[in-house]
Amino acid sequence: MTQYTPMIQQYLKVKADYQDAFLFFRLGDFYEMFFEDAVKAAHELEITLTSRDGGSSERIPMCGVPYHAAKNYIEQLVEKGYKVAVCEQVEDPKTAKGVVRREVVQLITPGTMMEGRTIDEKENNFLAALTHFEDGSYALACNDLTTGQNTVTLLTGSVEDILLEVYATGSKEIVVDSSFSKDELNKLTETLKMTISYEDATAIPEGLEHLVKNVSQAKLIKAVGRLFNYVIRTQKRSLDHLQPVEIYYTNQFMKIDVHSKRNLELTETLRTKEKTGSLLWLLDKTKTAMGGRMLKQWMERPLIQKERIEERLEMVETFVNDYFLREDLKEKLKEVYDLERLAGKVAFGNVNARDLLQLRRSLLQVPAILEAISLLDNAYAARLIQGADPCESLTELLGRSIQENPPLSIKDGDIIKDGYNDKLDQYRYVSKNGKTWIAELEKRERDITGIKSLKIGYNRIFGYYIEVTKANLGALPEGRYERKQTLANAERFITDELKEKETLILEAEEKIVQLEYDLFTALREEVKVFIPKLQHLAKVISELDVLQSFATVSEEEQFVKPVLTTKREIFIKDGRHPVVEKVLNGKLYVPNDCIMPENMDVFLITGPNMSGKSTYMRQLALVTVMSQIGCFVPATEAVLPVFDQIFTRIGAADDLISGQSTFMVEMLEAKNAIANASERSLILFDEIGRGTSTYDGMALAQAIIEHIHDQIGAKTLFSTHYHELTVLEDSLDQLKNVHVSAIEENGKVVFLHKIQDGAADKSYGIHVAQLAELPDSLIARAKEVLAQLEGQEEIVIPKRVEVKAQEQEVIPEPIVVKEEPIEIEETKVDNEEESQLSFFGAEQSSKKQAKPALDAKETAVLTQIKKIDLLDMTPLEAMNELYRLQKKLKKG
């Protein structure tokens, strides 16, 4: 390192502490980058890569950006997942001895960005910290530096479950300790696409202990400590806006995994990943940025406490019934800026005068808002605004201190009002009168010299001067002025009197700018005292904003207040899919009932492709979510239970599980539901089994239906193309067949989109192909093939039978299918009547079949089958075992 110049040595020393970040190294009016940083930054930012002499034999790669434009370049890098360490000159170059001292003043990362285009006003920007414990549990702490919000929770379960909870926070960066395994880190980076950062310190930093007073579990404190230590280490400044840590537990809210959230398009659409077209898009009528953020948080975690849901619903009902109250509230909310993020900027020290002006305008609306809500006869409303301080003294302070149209910069003056500070008023008097004197001097000199073009000007190099054109130099009295500068067409002069006034004016202006800056920073410190009150106000206003948003959309879309019941029953009259109905934009939407009494758990849905089966299923889920976040629902009447979880298998494979086939994804999501669902859950399965052969798919579909029906008892909508499964209605007393109706007119299919009792007679797949405008020749051939297939023997689904066991359980008799003659190696088995292949048993059910000779491999498999205890296996386990044995038979 000694071969480099002192400045490059300084750079390398600083860079050694920030190996995973771009180092923006301040040199005069530029931030420079060197070596590998320069090469990479030039590529990412599309700026010129150059080089400089650094004292070594080879020139050093270099690139740079102007300091006044650095913010834009930093945002570009952070948006791409990089970190940027900002290294400033921390001493005056004029007084420095040797190399100017430089220090990193801030490390900017995806999870610690405070402002810029990467920060959506209606999105939180969470930084996550994950701590792994020896017992297999994890603690997850999150911080939004822009608002000061802090949360923590304890997580148990599989690594995949943990990752999905991390993903649900929307964090762009996650902090872990250096002992995290490579496998765990790979899942974080590859699966969740997050920036990884490291922090080993877990003790709560000094001065922040008050933020964890309500946290007693050591595991949670460790996670919060890791988070706080990282934030302090990277930001290197006051964090007075950090709020007390909120503990939440996942079992306090309805669980909806990421797959289901995506399938249901709660906050973004499945295809475009955009808000437009999602349920959030429909429900978001909030007027404030902080209200928008709270709405999304509510949608991420619907409630499961009946009383809390009903409180919200009652407030929404109040706003729905009182149009004038709602409209007046909306008008006031329009004038309220983002109090949470304004408070964060105050604490962070990057608030400007315009921000404080916005704060004042916001606070002016608060007294009227609080008064209007206080007049409501509603316990929830009274509790909500309890302790809310309108901060009227702060409003008054800002009103007499900040100019109405201040500049963006706090270093250019013209921020503070006249009358706020006596000394500032004195300086302004001198400056103002001095300039008046300059104007009077110019007029006087014109009169004395008779030169009408004579003027007095100013520049930073020469100060004030008298300018006379060369054509008028002869008219000047001898010795009146002292020559200062010669121009091509004029001469500039000064006088002793002019220089004296200049000194007074410039000193006053310089002192004005400095004093205004000092007064503003002092004012900022006074505002800091109000941060806790502002944050409390922000929560109150955010909640009111979300509730009025629910009321507004409920009124506009003619939603109805749901009735919550402790019974396991669903009664939805004329239910609609809220987003589809909105997108239809006035076109007739066909509503559908969903009536499932306590003794009805499963709807087996059949019907044509494109008829609306998936829409009907999503509709029920969205109605449920809307109900449990406290919103009215799209129906004419709705009685609903409180669901603890929603599981879905709808639509295309989710890209979170990469490298898996559609069928494997189906099975994984089915497993998730079967393993975790309770009788208080809602399960939506669309076309389970489509990713494998017909027989395998049908067998699995039946096994899953029976397991849900017999073992779980969850309310379930199960759509299928396996029409043979509709006979299950005869053997499963809590299953009901329903179908989406369609009719044929003049050879064309007409989808009625209406749910009716009973099973569908056909799927109309070829008609859908015609709608897709497949070639006529292809359609004709498909009809020929269909006619041939329909002439063959059909698949038979037998009734369930009782099997005597120690506890007389009822288990399903094997699914059986009509088949052509079965060939096992060289031995043929001919069907005289029926030949049935058992999926759960070992014997052929047709007694008239000839018994084939078995080879050694088949005998071994048969022996294994005889040893299987079906009563001790789930249907899925039985299918897996059958699949293994089948593969064994096929080998060789």
UniProtKB/Swiss-Prot annotation:
Record carries keyword DNA damage: yes
SUPFAM superfamilies with a match to the protein in the record: DNA repair protein MutS, domain I, DNA repair protein MutS, domain II, DNA repair protein MutS, domain III, P-loop containing nucleoside triphosphate hydrolases
Domain of life: Bacteria
Gene Ontology CC entries for this record: cytosol
Alphabetized SMART domains for the sequence: MUTSac, MUTSd
InterPro entries: DNA_mismatch_repair_MutS, DNA_mismatch_repair_MutS-lik_N, DNA_mismatch_repair_MutS/MSH, DNA_mismatch_repair_MutS_C, DNA_mismatch_repair_MutS_clamp, DNA_mismatch_repair_MutS_core, DNA_mismatch_repair_MutS_N, DNA_mismatch_repair_MutS_sf
GO BP annotation list: mismatch repair
PROSITE patterns from the UniProt entry: DNA_MISMATCH_REPAIR_2
Gene Ontology MF terms: ATP binding; ATP-dependent DNA damage sensor activity; damaged DNA binding; mismatched DNA binding
Job of this protein: This protein is involved in the repair of mismatches in DNA. It is possible that it carries out the mismatch recognition step. This protein has a weak ATPase activity.
Name the record gives this protein: DNA mismatch repair protein MutS
Species of the source: Bacillus cereus (strain AH820)
